């Protein structure tokens, strides 16, 4: 993921637009657009220690780990 895919802040409306392919998702916060770009990338770096299932976002792993509470 690079500056080309993230875009830049506009001087008029402070929008950031995803430049990936034909996707034009727009947000005002850089961390939101970088989080969004993960939907375009097949990487899943957050792995569950209990079952090995992998997730793109740490918050998704955290939610998943709670399902193992009864294990």
Swiss-Prot record:
- One matching Pfam family, short form? zf-C2H2
Keyword check for Metal-binding: yes
GO CC annotations, alphabetized: nucleus
Supply one GO molecular-function term.
zinc ion binding
**One GO BP annotation here?**
positive regulation of transcription by RNA polymerase II
Coarsely, its chief localization is nucleus
Q: Which domain of life is it from?
A: Eukaryota
Q: What PROSITE patterns has UniProt attached to this entry?
A: ZINC_FINGER_C2H2_1 (PS00028), ZINC_FINGER_C2H2_2 (PS50157)
Q: Which UniProt keywords apply?
A: Activator, DNA-binding, Metal-binding, Nucleus, Repeat, Repressor, Transcription, Transcription regulation, Zinc, Zinc-finger
Please indicate if the UniProt record lists Ligase as a keyword: no
Q: Where in the cell is it found?
A: Nucleus
> Where are the C2H2-type Zn fingers located?
16-40, 46-68
Q: What does this protein do?
A: Transcription factor that mediates regulation of both acid- and alkaline-expressed genes in response to ambient pH. At alkaline ambient pH, activates transcription of alkaline-expressed genes (including pacC itself) and represses transcription of acid-expressed genes.
- What family does the database annotate? Belongs to the pacC/RIM101 family.
What name does this protein carry? pH-response transcription factor pacC/RIM101
């Amino acid at each position: 993921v690079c500056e080309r895919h993230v875009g830049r802040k506009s001087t008029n409306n402070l929008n950031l637009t995803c430049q990936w392919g034909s996707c034009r998702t727009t947000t005002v916060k850089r961390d939101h657009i970088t989080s969004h770009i993960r939907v375009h990338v097949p990487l899943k770096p957050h792995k569950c220690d209990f079952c090995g299932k992998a997730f793109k976002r740490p918050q998704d792993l955290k939610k998943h780990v709670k399902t193992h509470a009864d294990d």
